[in-house]
Amino acid sequence: MKTIECKAPAKVNYRLDVLRRRPDGYHDLRMIMQRIDLCDDIRISLSETPGVRVACGKEGVPDGPGNIAWRAADALLKLSGRCTGIDISIVKNIPVAAGLGGGSSDCASALMGVNELLELHLTDEQLMEAGSKLGADVPFFIFKKTALAEGIGDKLAAVEAAPAWLVIVNPNLAVSTAWVYQNLQLTAGKDEYIIPRFYGSVSDICAILANDLEKVTIGRFPVINQIKQKLLQVGAAGSLMSGSGSTVFGIFAEEAPARKAAEKLSRESDWFVAAVKTL
């Protein structure tokens, strides 16, 4: 049976502003989102056995309907009207519940892969619309560009950002996004700030690094602030928590100092550490 293999990249947030709470309980956001080459490995196959099956084997990642990649494949299979099966294998290289969008990226890969396997010929816009019903970050991974994301993250506009190397550090802590938002104290006045659409250098990127969720997560997990400081000490031009945490990244202009910093932090801790480049 036909099979597709693909990479599902992680993301970081160069900026995350929480503007207001919406009547539906969600929040209006404004974010700069950047894909990186830390990827899950996805394999999607057609099967003669009807239904959708997801195999992962990673603690904290469900295999059935609790996995949004499963729900993505199930939705498109029902849309096709075909009595066939879809098997999805996920090798998790992206830390789970870490602010890197791994689950959303897996979901986006499932939508794009199943669309191809079943020859549905859905456009990226149609896939993004379907993805927005499954997870706020899913459309971004179908968009495949550095983006200014607004609304709940589903309104996307392309942004130009200089290539960079990042050192990703995760202290092996899973953070509940819902808990972070529930404990967030909103501040007024964010709407007036104009987000640039062009970042010609790492210095330009560092100038807009900010995350409204940091204070909440650091309040519960002070190690996140310690990691931010360590990244600056080993040469990062700037450091920031990604998403709701607990991953922190440091930004570098060149590969060699990024790899050197990652090696040093790996030797000194039992944290997940990786030097990655932007996509």
UniProtKB/Swiss-Prot annotation:
EC number from the UniProt entry: 2.7.1.148
Pathway annotation from the record: Isoprenoid biosynthesis; isopentenyl diphosphate biosynthesis via DXP pathway; isopentenyl diphosphate from 1-deoxy-D-xylulose 5-phosphate: step 3/6
InterPro entries: GHMP_kinase_C_dom, GHMP_kinase_C_sf, GHMP_kinase_N_dom, IspE, Ribosomal_Su5_D2-typ_SF, Ribsml_uS5_D2-typ_fold_subgr
Top-rank taxon: Bacteria
Reaction catalysed by this enzyme: 4-CDP-2-C-methyl-D-erythritol + ATP = 4-CDP-2-C-methyl-D-erythritol 2-phosphate + ADP + H(+)
Binding sites annotated in the UniProt record for ATP: P95, V96, A97, A98, G99, L100, G101, G102, G103, S104, S105
Record keywords, A-Z: ATP-binding, Isoprene biosynthesis, Kinase, Nucleotide-binding, Transferase
GO MF annotation list: 4-(cytidine 5'-diphospho)-2-C-methyl-D-erythritol kinase activity; ATP binding
GO biological process: isopentenyl diphosphate biosynthetic process, methylerythritol 4-phosphate pathway; terpenoid biosynthetic process
Sections of the chain in a coiled coil: none
Residues the record marks as active site: K11, D137
Function: Catalyzes the phosphorylation of the position 2 hydroxy group of 4-diphosphocytidyl-2C-methyl-D-erythritol.
Similarity comment text for this entry: Belongs to the GHMP kinase family. IspE subfamily.
UniProt-recorded name of the protein: 4-diphosphocytidyl-2-C-methyl-D-erythritol kinase
